[in-house]
From Swiss-Prot:
Domain of life according to the entry: Bacteria
Protein name listed in UniProt: Dihydroorotase
Keywords: Hydrolase, Metal-binding, Pyrimidine biosynthesis, Zinc
Pathway: Pyrimidine metabolism; UMP biosynthesis via de novo pathway; (S)-dihydroorotate from bicarbonate: step 3/3
Biological process (GO), any one: 'de novo' UMP biosynthetic process
Cofactor dependence: Zn(2+)
Catalytic reaction annotation: (S)-dihydroorotate + H2O = N-carbamoyl-L-aspartate + H(+)
Species in which this protein is naturally found: Helicobacter pylori (strain ATCC 700392 / 26695) (Campylobacter pylori)
Entry's cofactor comment: Binds 2 Zn(2+) ions per subunit.
Amino acid sequence: MEITLFDPIDAHLHVRENALLKAVLGYSSEPFSAAVIMPNLSKPLIDTPTTLEYEEEILNHSSNFKPLMSLYFNDGLTLEELQCAKEKGVRFLKLYPKGMTTNAQNGTSDLLGEKTLEVLENAQKLGFILCIHAEQTGFCLDKEFLCHSVLETFALSFPKLKIIIEHLSDWRSIALIEKHDNLYATLTLHHISMTLDDLLGGSLNPHCFCKPLIKTKKDQERLLSLALKAHPKISFGSDSAPHFISKKHSANIPAGIFSAPILLPALCELFEKHNALENLQAFISDNAKTIYGLENLPSKKARLSKKPFMIPTHTLCLNEKIAILRGGETLSWNLQEIA
């Protein structure tokens, strides 16, 4: 059995920087046609020049791949700055509530503040797409739910602004997407295939720790259902986020799951298991093209066959190891060729 996926798109990707970027980028740039690149670096991408420098770094270490760049939402994003970014091809804003995830210490503290709303108004005028890490301070399993009032305010106040709830993790958010025409979402492999049991049901597994947290069986099943039917307001976004094992095994574990090396085979296995392989093309590419208005992307054909694939336990960077999701397991699908 074989399947060919055309122009796979990852609508949420972390490729880090410097040596780590060189070590992990190929896992995404080779099989994927394009990816929305996250701006939460150690020095956030808060303006157009730094964003373009990072884009150049990615392009210098990849080929036939389109990085879709995003700006780190901040109060300094004036109308002039946004116009400059748009002229240079930057179409995405990423809003991080302050302190909610990795490198979000410079995030937005007042989500409904005057300055935040002013930036959003300008973003709407210029046709930007807003991607949001939709969590608010509160009990860890309710953080996304607690952000619903903010999301509703954004959706109603800026009806022409496309708003993406990144890495949807709570089944209660589904109703919001179906209620508001301008609300969309991305789904990760881990949120549609894993639950809290994978993180802490046995021994604590730091390599399954991410934000937003993987949640209950009900959440996983409801979100998986959206993916399997390729809901038209949902696109695939891996949120693949590599960290060194030395940091993952520390007393202060960073959030992030490195899933890039297994994405296409694992999705094939999951969709075949649920008799939904015919919908994988829409989930992995077609929906994103429609939602984000993507055209003239590099052409890619990823051919996968139903043959065993033993997942490596890790990859290397500067003699440090980076653990790969489900490392040591065997998938029933294998990526055979990229053309």
